[in-house]
Amino acid sequence: MGAGGKMTEQEREKQEQQLARGASTMQRSPVEKPPFTVGQIKKAIPPHCFQRSVLKSFSYVVRDLVIAAALLYFALAIIPALPSPLHYAAWPLYWIAQGCVCFAMWVIAHECGHHAFSDYQLLDDIVGLVLHSSLMVPYFSWKYSHRRHHSNTGSLERDEVFVPKTKGALAWYAPYVYNNPVGRLVHIVVQLTLGWPLYLATNVSGRPYPRFACHYDPYGPIYNDRERAQIFVSDAGVMAVSFGLYKLAATLGFWWVVRVYAVPLLIVNVWLVLVTYLHHTHPALPHYDSREWDWLRGALSTVDRDYGVFNRFFHNITDTHVVHHLFSTLPHFHATEATKAIKPILGEYYQFDPTPIAKATWREARECIFVEPEEGRGVFWYNKF
C-alpha cells in the first residue's frame, strides 16, 4: 500500500488485471470518513467538464435517432424481403440492436432529469419527457424518485432502489432459490425482464413506505405536494404513447407492434436493470444505517464497470457512474475526463471492476444475497447463505 494506507495507481492496476483474469474479489471500499471533501474533488476536475452544451447534447440525440430510424427501415423494408432462414435470423438482430439504441436514448433522458442536458431546465424537461414517454417511462415520476436515490445512496433506511435486505427479512424460501443454480438463473431472468415495470408499478426492490407506492400515482407516498401536478403530466405522456401503440396495433396488427416496438423495449428494460444493479451491487460496496451514513460515503458506495464497446455507445453511463453520483449535473460527454481527474483524489474510495459483465452478474447474484452489519457499527456488507 502507498503512504497513509492508500492504494497506489500501480497496485490498483494490478488488482484490476487480476480481476480481469478471473479473481473473484476486490478490496473492500474504505468506510471511514474520507480525508477529502466534495469541494476538493470538484477542484480536481477541469472547469470545462461542468459546462453543458445544447448543440453537443442534441448531437447525441440526433445520433441515436438516426440509428434507430435506420434500424426501423431495416425491420420494415429489408427483413420482409429476405428469404425465410435469413428472415427469422434477422429479427433477433434487429431486436437487440434497436434495444441497445433505445437504451442509449433512455440514458439521454436520464441526463435531462439531472439537468445535465443543457442550461435550460424547461428544455431538459421537454426533451426528457418526450424521450422517456416514448419508452413508457413516466419522466417526472422517475426523475423525482431518482433524485432521492442520489440524495440517499447507500442508506439502508432512505435509499430508493436496490435496497438490500438483512438476512432475517428474507423469505423462508430464499436459500433454496439463491443456493440453487437453476433458481438463481430464474431469479436473474425475472429481475432483468420484469424488474423495471414492477418497480414503477409496485416499488419492487425500493425502500419501504407506510403505504402502497407506485410511480404512476400522483398522490402516492413517493411524492410531495409540489410534485404531484407533474406526475399527472408523466402519466399523460405514457398514456399518449400507449394510445398511439393501440392505434398502430388496430391498423397493422398486434404482432407488428410486438415485433417492432415491444421486444426492443424489453431489451431496454433488461439493460436498465442490469446496469443499475451492477452499479450498486458488489461484495466490495458498503451500505450504512443512520448511525454511520453520510452523503459523501453513500455517493462513493457505487462501482464503475467495463462494458467494452457499449461504454461509449451508452454514453458512458456504465464506466463513469462514480463521478455521476458525485456531480449529477456534469454532462456525460465530459464524464470520462472527469473520472480520470478524480481517481488520484479518491484513491481506495474509487471502485472499478473490469470483470466481464455476464460473469459479474452471476457472481453478484450468488454472493450479494443480504447484508450483515460489522460488529458494533452501522456499516453493512453483502453476504450469502
UniProtKB/Swiss-Prot annotation:
<feature type="transmembrane region" description="Helical">
    <location>
        <begin position="89"/>
        <end position="109"/>
    </location>
</feature>
<dbReference type="GO" id="GO:0006636">
    <property type="term" value="P:unsaturated fatty acid biosynthetic process"/>
</dbReference>
<dbReference type="InterPro" id="IPR012171">
    <property type="entry name" value="Fatty_acid_desaturase"/>
</dbReference>
<keyword id="KW-0443">Lipid metabolism</keyword>
<protein>
    <recommendedName>
        <fullName>Fatty acid desaturase DES2</fullName>
        <ecNumber>1.14.19.-</ecNumber>
    </recommendedName>
</protein>
<keyword id="KW-0275">Fatty acid biosynthesis</keyword>
<comment type="similarity">
    <text>Belongs to the fatty acid desaturase type 1 family.</text>
</comment>
<feature type="short sequence motif" description="Histidine box-1">
    <location>
        <begin position="110"/>
        <end position="114"/>
    </location>
</feature>
<feature type="short sequence motif" description="Histidine box-2">
    <location>
        <begin position="146"/>
        <end position="150"/>
    </location>
</feature>
<feature type="short sequence motif" description="Histidine box-3">
    <location>
        <begin position="321"/>
        <end position="325"/>
    </location>
</feature>
<feature type="transmembrane region" description="Helical">
    <location>
        <begin position="231"/>
        <end position="251"/>
    </location>
</feature>
<keyword id="KW-0812">Transmembrane</keyword>
<dbReference type="Pfam" id="PF11960">
    <property type="entry name" value="DUF3474"/>
</dbReference>
<dbReference type="InterPro" id="IPR005804">
    <property type="entry name" value="FA_desaturase_dom"/>
</dbReference>
<dbReference type="Pfam" id="PF00487">
    <property type="entry name" value="FA_desaturase"/>
</dbReference>
<feature type="region of interest" description="Disordered">
    <location>
        <begin position="1"/>
        <end position="33"/>
    </location>
</feature>
<feature type="transmembrane region" description="Helical">
    <location>
        <begin position="185"/>
        <end position="205"/>
    </location>
</feature>
<keyword id="KW-0444">Lipid biosynthesis</keyword>
<dbReference type="GO" id="GO:0016020">
    <property type="term" value="C:membrane"/>
</dbReference>
<keyword id="KW-0472">Membrane</keyword>
<feature type="transmembrane region" description="Helical">
    <location>
        <begin position="254"/>
        <end position="274"/>
    </location>
</feature>
<comment type="pathway">
    <text>Lipid metabolism; polyunsaturated fatty acid biosynthesis.</text>
</comment>
<keyword id="KW-0560">Oxidoreductase</keyword>
<dbReference type="InterPro" id="IPR021863">
    <property type="entry name" value="FAS_N"/>
</dbReference>
<dbReference type="GO" id="GO:0016717">
    <property type="term" value="F:oxidoreductase activity, acting on paired donors, with oxidation of a pair of donors resulting in the reduction of molecular oxygen to two molecules of water"/>
</dbReference>
<keyword id="KW-1133">Transmembrane helix</keyword>
<keyword id="KW-0276">Fatty acid metabolism</keyword>
<comment type="function">
    <text>Delta(12) fatty acid desaturase converting palmitoleic acid (16:1(9)) to hexadecadienoic acid (16:2(9,12)). No detectable Delta(12)linoleate desaturase activity. Involved in the biosynthesis of the aliphatic side chain of sorgoleone, a phytotoxic secondary metabolite playing a direct role in allelopathic interactions.</text>
</comment>
<feature type="transmembrane region" description="Helical">
    <location>
        <begin position="122"/>
        <end position="142"/>
    </location>
</feature>
<feature type="transmembrane region" description="Helical">
    <location>
        <begin position="65"/>
        <end position="85"/>
    </location>
</feature>
<dbReference type="GO" id="GO:0016491">
    <property type="term" value="F:oxidoreductase activity"/>
</dbReference>
